[in-house]
Amino acid sequence: MWNLFNKKNKTDGEHRTLQLITDKGMPFGYVEAYKSLRTNLDFMAGSMDVHTLVITSTVPEESKSNVAVNLAMTMAESGKKVALIDCDLRKPVLHRYLKAGHNVKGVSNVLSNQCTLDEALHELKEMNLTFLPAGTPPPNPSEMLSQPQMQAMVNTLREKFDVVIFDAPPVSVVTDAAVIGRYVDGAIFVVRSDFAPADAVRGAVKKLQDDGVRVLGSVLTRYDMKKALKGSSYAYSYAYNYNYAYEKQKADVTE
Protein backbone atom coordinates (compact mmCIF):
# COMPACT_ATOMS: atom_id res chain seq x y z
CA MET A 1 0.00 0.00 0.00
CA TRP A 2 1.22 3.48 -0.86
CA ASN A 3 0.70 6.06 1.87
CA LEU A 4 -0.29 9.69 1.32
CA PHE A 5 -0.26 11.02 4.84
CA ASN A 6 -1.08 13.95 7.09
CA LYS A 7 -2.83 16.02 4.46
CA LYS A 8 -6.59 16.51 4.56
CA ASN A 9 -8.70 17.96 1.79
CA LYS A 10 -10.32 21.24 2.64
CA THR A 11 -14.08 21.26 2.38
CA ASP A 12 -16.66 23.99 2.03
CA GLY A 13 -20.01 22.28 2.00
CA GLU A 14 -20.10 20.32 -1.21
CA HIS A 15 -17.43 22.48 -2.83
CA ARG A 16 -14.36 20.41 -2.09
CA THR A 17 -10.97 21.54 -3.32
CA LEU A 18 -7.98 19.60 -4.50
CA GLN A 19 -4.69 19.54 -2.63
CA LEU A 20 -2.21 19.69 -5.50
CA ILE A 21 1.43 18.72 -5.24
CA THR A 22 2.26 22.09 -6.80
CA ASP A 23 0.42 24.10 -4.14
CA LYS A 24 2.54 26.47 -2.11
CA GLY A 25 3.52 25.04 1.27
CA MET A 26 2.68 21.45 0.37
CA PRO A 27 4.62 19.14 2.75
CA PHE A 28 7.69 17.45 1.28
CA GLY A 29 6.46 14.02 2.37
CA TYR A 30 3.17 14.50 0.55
CA VAL A 31 4.92 15.28 -2.74
CA GLU A 32 7.42 12.44 -2.29
CA ALA A 33 4.60 9.96 -1.67
CA TYR A 34 3.30 10.59 -5.19
CA LYS A 35 6.78 10.22 -6.62
CA SER A 36 7.05 6.88 -4.84
CA LEU A 37 3.71 5.85 -6.33
CA ARG A 38 4.96 6.86 -9.77
CA THR A 39 8.13 4.82 -9.31
CA ASN A 40 6.14 1.72 -8.39
CA LEU A 41 3.84 2.14 -11.37
CA ASP A 42 6.79 2.70 -13.70
CA PHE A 43 8.23 -0.58 -12.47
CA MET A 44 4.95 -2.34 -13.18
CA ALA A 45 4.69 -0.76 -16.61
CA GLY A 46 8.03 -2.27 -17.55
CA SER A 47 6.95 -5.81 -16.75
CA MET A 48 3.15 -5.83 -16.97
CA ASP A 49 2.24 -3.38 -19.75
CA VAL A 50 0.44 -0.96 -17.43
CA HIS A 51 -0.41 2.27 -19.24
CA THR A 52 -4.12 2.78 -18.54
CA LEU A 53 -5.40 2.99 -14.96
CA VAL A 54 -8.71 3.47 -13.22
CA ILE A 55 -8.74 5.16 -9.80
CA THR A 56 -11.61 4.25 -7.50
CA SER A 57 -12.54 3.74 -3.84
CA THR A 58 -15.09 2.04 -1.63
CA VAL A 59 -17.26 5.05 -0.80
CA PRO A 60 -17.33 8.78 -1.62
CA GLU A 61 -15.00 11.29 0.08
CA GLU A 62 -11.91 9.07 0.18
CA SER A 63 -9.85 11.55 -1.91
CA LYS A 64 -9.73 9.40 -5.04
CA SER A 65 -10.07 12.42 -7.36
CA ASN A 66 -7.25 14.09 -5.48
CA VAL A 67 -5.11 11.00 -6.06
CA ALA A 68 -6.06 10.83 -9.73
CA VAL A 69 -5.10 14.45 -10.44
CA ASN A 70 -1.86 14.42 -8.46
CA LEU A 71 -0.77 11.09 -9.90
CA ALA A 72 -1.41 12.43 -13.39
CA MET A 73 0.63 15.55 -12.62
CA THR A 74 3.46 13.50 -11.13
CA MET A 75 3.55 11.25 -14.18
CA ALA A 76 3.64 14.30 -16.45
CA GLU A 77 6.56 15.76 -14.49
CA SER A 78 8.67 12.80 -15.57
CA GLY A 79 8.18 13.71 -19.22
CA LYS A 80 5.33 11.34 -20.00
CA LYS A 81 2.41 12.33 -22.19
CA VAL A 82 -0.52 11.98 -19.78
CA ALA A 83 -4.30 12.14 -20.14
CA LEU A 84 -6.69 12.48 -17.19
CA ILE A 85 -10.25 11.29 -17.81
CA ASP A 86 -13.26 12.18 -15.64
CA CYS A 87 -15.48 9.10 -15.80
CA ASP A 88 -17.91 10.13 -13.07
CA LEU A 89 -20.72 10.79 -15.52
CA ARG A 90 -23.29 11.29 -12.74
CA LYS A 91 -21.56 13.89 -10.60
CA PRO A 92 -18.59 15.23 -12.55
CA VAL A 93 -16.31 17.54 -10.57
CA LEU A 94 -12.88 17.54 -12.19
CA HIS A 95 -13.85 20.18 -14.76
CA ARG A 96 -14.55 22.54 -11.86
CA TYR A 97 -11.39 21.65 -9.95
CA LEU A 98 -9.27 22.06 -13.08
CA LYS A 99 -11.13 25.18 -14.28
CA ALA A 100 -12.04 23.66 -17.61
CA GLY A 101 -15.26 25.67 -17.85
CA HIS A 102 -18.94 24.77 -17.54
CA ASN A 103 -21.10 22.68 -19.86
CA VAL A 104 -17.99 21.39 -21.57
CA LYS A 105 -18.07 18.44 -23.93
CA GLY A 106 -16.51 15.24 -22.67
CA VAL A 107 -16.79 11.48 -22.35
CA SER A 108 -20.56 11.27 -22.68
CA ASN A 109 -20.58 13.51 -25.75
CA VAL A 110 -17.88 11.46 -27.44
CA LEU A 111 -19.66 8.18 -26.70
CA SER A 112 -22.95 9.55 -28.04
CA ASN A 113 -21.25 10.84 -31.22
CA GLN A 114 -22.00 14.48 -30.42
CA CYS A 115 -18.35 15.36 -30.92
CA THR A 116 -15.02 13.74 -31.70
CA LEU A 117 -12.49 12.77 -29.06
CA ASP A 118 -10.07 15.44 -30.23
CA GLU A 119 -12.79 18.09 -29.94
CA ALA A 120 -13.44 17.14 -26.30
CA LEU A 121 -9.82 17.03 -25.12
CA HIS A 122 -8.51 20.03 -23.15
CA GLU A 123 -4.84 20.94 -22.88
CA LEU A 124 -3.93 22.02 -19.33
CA LYS A 125 -0.61 23.67 -20.11
CA GLU A 126 0.17 24.69 -16.53
CA MET A 127 -0.10 21.04 -15.46
CA ASN A 128 1.35 19.62 -18.67
CA LEU A 129 -1.74 17.41 -18.93
CA THR A 130 -4.50 16.61 -21.37
CA PHE A 131 -7.92 16.48 -19.73
CA LEU A 132 -11.14 14.85 -20.91
CA PRO A 133 -14.16 16.04 -18.86
CA ALA A 134 -17.14 13.82 -18.12
CA GLY A 135 -19.37 15.85 -20.40
CA THR A 136 -23.13 16.23 -20.28
CA PRO A 137 -24.61 13.88 -17.61
CA PRO A 138 -26.47 11.12 -19.49
CA PRO A 139 -29.60 9.32 -18.24
CA ASN A 140 -27.87 5.92 -18.32
CA PRO A 141 -24.16 6.23 -17.41
CA SER A 142 -23.47 2.53 -16.76
CA GLU A 143 -25.06 1.49 -20.04
CA MET A 144 -23.17 4.19 -21.91
CA LEU A 145 -19.83 3.09 -20.45
CA SER A 146 -20.61 -0.52 -21.40
CA GLN A 147 -20.94 0.30 -25.08
CA PRO A 148 -18.27 -0.80 -27.61
CA GLN A 149 -17.57 2.90 -28.20
CA MET A 150 -16.04 3.09 -24.71
CA GLN A 151 -13.57 0.33 -25.48
CA ALA A 152 -12.74 2.06 -28.75
CA MET A 153 -12.16 5.37 -26.95
CA VAL A 154 -9.87 3.72 -24.40
CA ASN A 155 -7.87 2.12 -27.21
CA THR A 156 -7.51 5.46 -29.00
CA LEU A 157 -6.36 7.17 -25.81
CA ARG A 158 -3.84 4.39 -25.22
CA GLU A 159 -2.36 5.05 -28.65
CA LYS A 160 -2.21 8.82 -28.14
CA PHE A 161 -0.73 8.92 -24.63
CA ASP A 162 1.93 7.22 -22.51
CA VAL A 163 -0.34 7.12 -19.46
CA VAL A 164 -4.13 7.43 -19.24
CA ILE A 165 -5.78 7.82 -15.82
CA PHE A 166 -9.54 7.37 -15.39
CA ASP A 167 -11.23 8.82 -12.30
CA ALA A 168 -14.26 6.58 -11.63
CA PRO A 169 -17.09 6.61 -9.05
CA PRO A 170 -16.79 4.55 -5.84
CA VAL A 171 -17.41 0.81 -6.13
CA SER A 172 -20.13 0.66 -3.47
CA VAL A 173 -22.21 3.34 -5.21
CA VAL A 174 -22.43 2.22 -8.85
CA THR A 175 -20.91 -0.38 -11.19
CA ASP A 176 -19.04 2.13 -13.37
CA ALA A 177 -15.57 1.45 -11.92
CA ALA A 178 -15.90 -2.27 -12.65
CA VAL A 179 -17.09 -1.55 -16.19
CA ILE A 180 -14.16 0.79 -16.88
CA GLY A 181 -11.76 -1.56 -15.11
CA ARG A 182 -12.35 -4.25 -17.72
CA TYR A 183 -11.10 -1.91 -20.45
CA VAL A 184 -7.90 -0.75 -18.75
CA ASP A 185 -4.66 -2.34 -17.60
CA GLY A 186 -5.36 -2.10 -13.88
CA ALA A 187 -6.99 -0.34 -10.94
CA ILE A 188 -5.60 1.68 -8.05
CA PHE A 189 -7.83 1.46 -4.99
CA VAL A 190 -7.96 4.50 -2.69
CA VAL A 191 -8.62 3.93 1.03
CA ARG A 192 -9.14 6.85 3.38
CA SER A 193 -7.77 6.44 6.89
CA ASP A 194 -10.30 5.62 9.61
CA PHE A 195 -13.25 6.01 7.27
CA ALA A 196 -14.58 2.98 5.38
CA PRO A 197 -14.97 -0.16 7.54
CA ALA A 198 -12.51 -2.91 6.66
CA ASP A 199 -15.28 -5.33 5.65
CA ALA A 200 -16.60 -2.79 3.16
CA VAL A 201 -13.14 -2.31 1.68
CA ARG A 202 -12.61 -6.06 1.40
CA GLY A 203 -15.97 -6.41 -0.31
CA ALA A 204 -15.28 -3.61 -2.77
CA VAL A 205 -11.89 -5.03 -3.76
CA LYS A 206 -13.37 -8.50 -4.16
CA LYS A 207 -16.18 -7.12 -6.31
CA LEU A 208 -13.67 -5.56 -8.68
CA GLN A 209 -11.64 -8.75 -8.88
CA ASP A 210 -14.74 -10.89 -9.40
CA ASP A 211 -15.64 -8.60 -12.31
CA GLY A 212 -12.27 -9.27 -13.91
CA VAL A 213 -10.51 -6.06 -12.88
CA ARG A 214 -6.80 -6.32 -12.11
CA VAL A 215 -6.25 -4.49 -8.80
CA LEU A 216 -2.64 -3.32 -8.84
CA GLY A 217 -2.52 -1.92 -5.33
CA SER A 218 -3.97 0.65 -2.97
CA VAL A 219 -3.27 4.18 -1.83
CA LEU A 220 -3.89 5.18 1.79
CA THR A 221 -5.04 8.79 2.21
CA ARG A 222 -5.43 11.17 5.16
CA TYR A 223 -3.26 8.93 7.31
CA ASP A 224 -2.72 10.03 10.92
CA MET A 225 0.36 8.31 12.33
CA LYS A 226 -0.37 9.18 15.96
CA LYS A 227 -3.92 7.89 15.74
CA ALA A 228 -2.80 4.76 13.93
CA LEU A 229 -0.47 3.83 16.76
CA LYS A 230 -3.43 3.78 19.14
CA GLY A 231 -5.25 1.23 16.98
CA SER A 232 -8.51 1.37 15.10
CA SER A 233 -11.25 -0.96 13.90
CA TYR A 234 -11.33 0.75 10.53
CA ALA A 235 -9.64 -0.05 7.29
CA TYR A 236 -6.48 2.01 7.70
CA SER A 237 -5.28 -0.10 10.63
CA TYR A 238 -4.99 -3.11 8.35
CA ALA A 239 -2.12 -3.91 6.05
CA TYR A 240 -3.10 -4.39 2.45
CA ASN A 241 -0.73 -6.69 0.68
CA TYR A 242 -1.36 -6.84 -3.02
CA ASN A 243 0.72 -9.16 -5.13
CA TYR A 244 0.66 -6.72 -8.07
CA ALA A 245 -1.10 -9.37 -10.16
CA TYR A 246 1.97 -11.64 -10.22
CA GLU A 247 -0.03 -14.32 -8.47
CA LYS A 248 -3.83 -14.70 -8.63
CA GLN A 249 -4.65 -11.01 -8.15
CA LYS A 250 -5.98 -11.69 -4.66
CA ALA A 251 -5.95 -9.02 -1.98
CA ASP A 252 -4.75 -10.37 1.36
CA VAL A 253 -6.00 -8.22 4.23
CA THR A 254 -4.28 -8.97 7.52
CA GLU A 255 -4.62 -7.34 10.88
Predicted regions and their residues:
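P-loop NTP-binding module
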Residues: 1-255
